[in-house]
Regions:
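Terminal beta-strand-rich extracellular "head" domains
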Residues: 23-24, 72-83, 98-108, 126-129, ...
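Glycine-rich strand-loop-strand elements at beta-sheet edges
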Residues: 11-70, 89-95, 142, 147-156, ...
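A short, structured loop/turn motif at beta-sheet edges
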Residues: 4, 36-41, 70-74, 164-166
């Protein structure tokens, strides 16, 4: 806007997609104070959340990075990593490509890994239960994901005893919940940019 010479910019990357191994990583957070010329163009790219694994043995997708660009300077909040078939994804980080700015940032939290336990209903009926990990929180947020799925299976018949699908990550940048079905989606949450002036 006319007359504005300073901006305070906050950015969050997208959250990684979930998988059987756990939740996706949370998006990174980046913030900085920016001295600008009134009327300067600001280019913003919001990172998309990663898609969850499409098969029980597949990996979740990495999330997109969120960038804010003014002139040649780019502030980046990196997207979270998608979960693997065997573990949760790592959180995203942050960066600025110029020493002219002093950025503050916080990495996103890693997605929680899934946990498997075994038990018995009787001397002849045994089961396997998996608590799929929740997605990691984005950096500098207090919005916790509670989106991991759950599955218990009769080991003899392989019939589901109980099934709860993983859910999408919260906005901004929450990782998608863990899920071993490959059909629930469990996307990471999208990124976000807030500009204060």
């Amino acid at each position: 806007p006319a007359g504005v010479t300073k901006l305070f910019v906050e950015a969050w990357g997208g959250g990684g997609g979930g998988a059987a191994g756990g939740g996706g990583g949370g998006g990174g957070y980046a913030a900085t104070e920016w001295t600008v010329t009134p009327g300067a163009a600001v280019a913003i790219n919001i990172g998309e959340g990663g898609e969850g694994a499409s098969t029980p043995a597949g990996d979740g997708e990495n999330a997109g990075n969120t960038t804010v660009t003014i002139g040649a300077i780019v502030l980046t909040a990196y997207g979270g990593q998608g979960a693997y078939a065997g573990s949760g994804g790592f959180g995203g980080r942050f960066n600025v490509n110029s020493g002219a700015l002093m950025p503050y940032g916080q990495s996103g939290a890693a997605g929680e890994s899934s946990r498997e336990v075994y038990g018995a209903y009787s001397s002849t009926i045994f089961y396997t239960a998996v608590t799929y990990g929740k997605g990691g929180m984005a950096g500098n947020t207090s919005i916790e994901n509670s989106n991991g799925g759950f599955r218990s299976v009769n080991n003899s018949s392989l019939v589901n005893i109980k099934l709860i699908y993983g859910k999408n990550g919260t906005e901004p940048g929450g990782g998608g919940g863990g899920d071993g079905t490959g059909i629930s989606g469990n996307y990471g949450g999208p990124g976000l940019v807030i500009i204060h002036y």
